[in-house]
């Protein structure tokens, strides 16, 4: 469905435009003719990460871990990892990474199982993303949690082009620093 002509006509009579999308979409709209005083407010492609200090994490109460996991779930899953606040990477710092990771991901998995519905389109796109990442990255290991609603790629700390590595529908990348 190409609405380019409609967008061009609306742009010609706009005093302001709010442009929201990836860099390609923003650039497409910027090329359209607009009135001289038209103001563009852009929300282009963003990239979010999470950094967890495992030495502090192990000292959290179960209630605080559950609260943190819920916030991670809301930032990631409610927008299918397509919002600017949705983390793609989780960087773990500290000596207690392995025990912290298990506890964190188990909590996320539990919340996902209770609150997230997965449709056929999402399953297909997640598989497509999985194959694409398998081809393009050097993974240490891949962790599937139960029914595949949470997928974690563990990557060495030598990452090239991090901005091009993206998860979708519960696919995350983690690095131990």
Question: Each predicted region: which residue ranges?
Answer:
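Conserved NAD(P)+-binding/catalytic subdomain of aldehyde/semialdehyde dehydrogenases
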Residues: 1-90, 94-95
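NAD(P)-dependent aldehyde/semialdehyde dehydrogenase
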Residues: 66, 70, 79-177
């Amino acid at each position: 469905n190409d609405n380019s002509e409609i967008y061009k006509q609306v742009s010609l009579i706009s005093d302001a435009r709010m442009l929201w999308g990836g860099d390609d979409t923003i650039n497409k709209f910027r090329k359209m003719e607009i009135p001289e005083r038209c103001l563009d407010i852009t929300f282009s492609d963003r990239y979010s990460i999470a950094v967890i200090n495992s030495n502090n994490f192990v000292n959290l109460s179960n209630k605080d871990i559950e609260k943190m996991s819920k916030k991670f779930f809301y930032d990631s899953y409610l927008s299918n990892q397509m919002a600017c606040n949705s983390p793609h990477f989780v960087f773990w710092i500290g000596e207690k990474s392995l025990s912290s990771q298990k506890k964190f991901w188990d909590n996320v998995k539990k919340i996902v199982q209770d609150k997230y519905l997965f449709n056929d389109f999402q399953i297909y796109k997640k598989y497509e993303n999985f194959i694409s990442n398998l081809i393009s990255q050097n993974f240490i290991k891949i962790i599937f949690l139960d029914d595949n609603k949470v997928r974690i790629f563990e990557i060495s700390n030598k990452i090239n082009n991090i901005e091009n590595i993206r998860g979708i529908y519960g696919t995350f990348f983690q690095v131990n620093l």
